[in-house]
Amino acid sequence: MSQDLKKKIREEYVRCAASPAYFMRKYCYIQHPKRGRIQFNLYPFQDKVLTLFQENPYSIVLKSRQLGISTLSAGYSLWMMLFHQDKNILCIATKQETAKNMVTKVKFMYDSLPSWLKEKQKPSEDNKL
């Protein structure tokens, strides 16, 4: 790998670490029910929720369905796992299937990342990333 490429990767890594919104827009893909794998484009209100998550680690979001908050939470969880390894992520839901769905979203995003953004070792348990 050339020094130029290493420098670009290092700069991009630092940029991703500094901004979860940038990381999600640039490198996260989601599974759309009709269009398949698509880039995760944040809506303006999702940017606001993301800022809320960053400024208030214990956030409660009153929301309606189909706003993409679960997907946003999955992306934020992935960002935290990659760039804040001193943190633990716990997913609690009303049903086990809902929690498993969140883990599936995170895994899908993780699997779509470029290799230089992925962790070197991946846990073997199905409910962990």
Model-identified regions with their sequence ranges:
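Phosphate/NTP-binding elements of NTP-utilizing enzymes
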Residues: 2-129
